[in-house]
Regions:
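Sequence signature of WD/YWTD-type beta-propeller architectures
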Residues: 1-119
Length: 119
């Protein structure tokens, strides 16, 4: 997904053996890994001010997949410090929870889908 200022494209890649968040310039240069933790991180969406990137993290190893019906959490990455903050506690979600652009125009809210468990 493009940053609002058009300077970066944010994406996820499994190139290290675990899914992580990256960014690169629109011409493909300056590729930079942004997450380095033990989670599989998916669906990065930069904020309107380009200061943070929201994404979901799977708590169990999904081996490059992003299924629905798993334990995930919504997290924020500070693009300057690279610090990651948990925005939500663990919830039941995954594929379909946070796939599309989800920031409000003023950057103060995020929309996401939380599933109900049926046993």
């Amino acid at each position: 997904e493009y940053s609002y200022d058009g300077q970066w494209i944010y994406f996820n890649s499994h190139r290290t053996g675990r899914m992580h968040v990256y960014r690169m310039k629109p011409d493909g240069t300056k590729q930079e890994q942004l997450t380095f933790d033990a989670f599989d991180n998916w669906f990065p969406h930069p904020s309107p001010d380009n200061r943070t990137v929201a994404f979901i993290s799977y708590l169990e190893d999904q081996k490059g997949q992003h299924p629905f019906g798993r334990e995930v959490k919504l997290r924020l990455l500070d693009t300057q410090t690279k610090k990651i903050t948990d925005l939500t506690p663990v919830f039941y979600g995954g594929q379909g929870s946070f796939n599309v652009h989800s920031w409000s125009p003023d950057g103060k809210k995020l929309a996401f889908v939380k599933y109900t468990r049926f046993n």
